[in-house]
Structures are given as structure tokens and as C-alpha cells.
Amino acid sequence: MKTNFLAFGMSTLVAKNIGSITQVIGPVLDVAFSPGKMPNIYNSLIVKDQNSAGEEINVTCEVQQLLGNNKVRAVAMSATDGMMRGMKVIDTGAPLTVPVGEATLGRIFNVLGEPVDNLGPVEVTTTFPIHRAAPAFTQLDTKLSIFETGIKVVDLLAPYRRGGKIGLFGGAGVGKTVLIMELINNILKAHGGVSVFGGVGERTREGNDLYMEMKESKVINEQNISESKVALVYGQMNEPPGARMRVGLTALTMAEYFRDVNKQDVLLFIDNIFRFVQAGSEVSALLGRMPSAVGYQPTLSTEMGTLQERITSTKEGSITSIQAVYVPADDLTDPAPATTFAHLDATTVLSRGLAAKGIYPAVDPLDSTSTMLQPWIVGEEHYETAQGVKQTLQRYKELQDIIAILGLDELSEEDRLTVARARKIERFLSQPFFVAEVFTGSPGKYVSLRETIKGFQMILSGELDSLPEQAFYLVGNIDEATAKAATLQVES
């Protein structure tokens, strides 16, 4: 069977370097090339042929190993069903390249940068290779600055670093998706930035739900797709490990364009960073490497470092990354989450208990941490206020058992005051979101860091002890709380 490679849009020059499959083991294949025509590591190979049923096969692979005897071992980015020994393979002579730029906003891509949302081809003029060097030391922005999100609980108690990495911990149904969408919305309004969402090895249903919710909350504008604020890249659970291992790099490459060329602040979401490690582990075993601790790949730290080092601030722009972290069997010492923690600047922990109370965002104020919460970075005023809030909430937590058994009346006057203030703080940490307006009917609020600090200082100082705690629930700044208290008084 003679294959016309020119019909596939390949130049005569590239079409000359053609190999053939010698072995297929699941998603891994060995390809033989002519002597002196060996492709480089990370080169993209394309299997273009027909299977025994006469159906076209078009599978992109990535070279991982040079085996000797003019053979290479490559990992397929899609299913290898129907592949046979002897099939022709084209060496493209370059790594995987993906489309970048404004045209990617509002669209969904797979690992190869192909649109999968049935909205037609993407009109792009620029493509970037997914394997790129991290910014050089001289390009890095070493200034520590806070990345204001407009979300009170985050900005006050676990502030994000501009160009930092944040771990997002939370089970199902505690508001992870809504928090992600609010951050996408706020970065556009406050920083004029864009977002890239990388769905790595998660459920297809969740990816679809996220897309539908983004359309509903206007993060993706269906009428005018170019006004959308986010590009989506999906490599879901059903994809081969090669795709799940590389989809994070595809999303990161799209984000790098906005940082380096457009000089914007970019939010990069990776959901879930554990699946990136898991896919690498599967590929490593298939490539015949000796596993290390708990069966993970021996190159775990290197793979994680290669991805994470590219996520940083430069003097031109920044990529701030929020990574959902799945902790297998809740074991924080497992090599996958343990390696991830080494790279994180802050953790945002979502609590099911707070979600059950109806306090959204359900960010746990005591479990969430940030390396930025230091007096010489955020300033004395911010630091003292945050510590005061945490101490009050911690004391309330300690007193809860006593309250449950004996009731509030058995507490000392001082403790009763602490409980009253803690309950106000807990409610004031809630906030109406812009992306939830559709469901709640109350308009979203962006609260600046200065207003957030002022509000919590007033609660801690006792200025607002006379106000009812309902006045602090789901409001923006402290002025809204006092206005709501006045309204409640009139109504009663």
C-alpha cells in the first residue's frame, strides 16, 4: 500500500524522513528509521496510514527514547487502536506545537491544540512548541508583591503572590469550580488579565459542567467569543497517559504567550496536578524505567520542576497558578503531593463544614496558609489584623465543645464577647460572587484589600459589637454591613 504523504500537507523535505512501526505496546510504539535520519527526543511523529479495515489512522506521538539500532520509542497522544507493525510514520522534525494568542480565548482544545468544541477552526497566526525553557534568572521579577483577588478571606488570611503557585484543596461539592470562575472574572476586571484552564486527567463530565457554567456566567461569551476571558485545554481521564502527561504543558504554553508577548497577568488553573504525576508514572513504567518510591517514576521531581519553573513572574508579566491537589488516601507524605508542596507559595483549603453552614466561599480561615503573610511583605497593619482574626476564630473553635454541652450562658463575659465577634468575622468572610449572581440574585462584590483590612479591624476593635451578626452575612465591604444592619432594624 503506497501512502501519498504530500496529500497530508507535508513538505517533500519532511516527507523524506519516514520510518515504520516495529512494535506497539499499548500507548507506546517503537519506530525504525533509516541510518542517520533519527528524530530528536520530543520530536513529534505522525502515524498516517490505513488499518486492515481500510480506515484512516492519524495519530500524533512524541519521541521519548532513542533505543539504538536506528529505533526510537514514542508515546501516543491518542488511542493506538488499529495500529500495526510496518505502518508508515512521518517525523515532523519539530516538537508538538500549539496555537497561541487571543483567538484561543473562549475555545476548548485538546493536547495537540486542536479545537474540540465544534465551533470550527481557530484563526491563529502564531504557534509555540510545548517544550520551552523556563525564563532566565535575569528575566525574573524578584519583587514580592501580593496578587489582589478581591476575595476577602483569600486577600486577608492567605494572600496569593503575583507569579506564585497556590494549591487548592477541597472535596466534591464545596465550591471549587465557583471559586475558580470568580478568580477568572476578577483577574480580568482588576488586572486586565486573562486565564487558561488546564483540565488534566479529570472527569469529562466535570469539564463539560465547567464549560456550561462559564457560558452561563458570561466568563465565556457565546455571542461574541472574542470577548471571552479564558482558554480551556482538556486531557481527560479517558485519554491515553501521553495526552494527560502533556496537556498541562499545552495550557502553560498558551499562558506563556499572554505573559511574554502580550505582557499581561495570567491566571493558570491546573485541575488536577496529581493526575499529571500519575500520567507520568504510567508512561515511565511503559518506557521500562525502574520505579522509585510507591511505584512513582524515578524522574518525578524533574518532571514536576520542569513544569513548575516555567510558571513565574518576569519583568514583563506574570503567570499566577492555582493548582487543585488531590491527596491520595489523604496521605500528605505520598511522593506526588509531597513533591507538589515544595513548589507552593500558598494553600487555599475549602471546608465542607463551612459549606454546610452556607458560608461561601467555604475557605477554611485556619487551615489555609501563605508564605506572603509576613509583616515585612504585607505590612504590620495587614499582618496584625490577620493574626487577630485567626486568634479570635481559634478561640471560638476551642469553645465550641463547651457551648455544645453547657450553652453560651456558662461562658465568661470575655469569652462571650469573643464568640460574638468570631461569629461576625465568620459571616463577614462570606461574600457574594459575580459568577453566582445568576443563582443567588444578589450582585457580586469585589472588595479591595484596604477595605477588607478596615472592616476586620472594626469588628476586632469592638466598634460593631452592637450590630446583629446577620448584617455581616454575604456583604462586600463593612459599609454594606452597617447599611444592612440599619435595614434589618427598620424591618424589625
From Swiss-Prot:
One of its GO terms (molecular function) is ATP hydrolysis activity. It comes from the Eukaryota. PROSITE patterns: ATPASE_ALPHA_BETA (PS00152). Keywords: ATP synthesis, ATP-binding, CF(1), Chloroplast, Hydrogen ion transport, Ion transport, Membrane, Nucleotide-binding, Plastid, Thylakoid, Translocase, Transport. It is found in: Plastid, Chloroplast thylakoid membrane. Its main location: plastid. GO terms for cellular component: chloroplast thylakoid membrane; proton-transporting ATP synthase complex. Belongs to the ATPase alpha/beta chains family. F-type ATPases have 2 components, CF(1) - the catalytic core - and CF(0) - the membrane proton channel. CF(1) has five subunits: alpha(3), beta(3), gamma(1), delta(1), epsilon(1). CF(0) has four main subunits: a(1), b(1), b'(1) and c(9-12). Produces ATP from ADP in the presence of a proton gradient across the membrane. The catalytic sites are hosted primarily by the beta subunits. This is ATP synthase subunit beta, chloroplastic. It comes from Marchantia polymorpha (Common liverwort). The lineage of its organism: Eukaryota, Viridiplantae, Streptophyta, Embryophyta, Marchantiophyta. The gene is atpB.
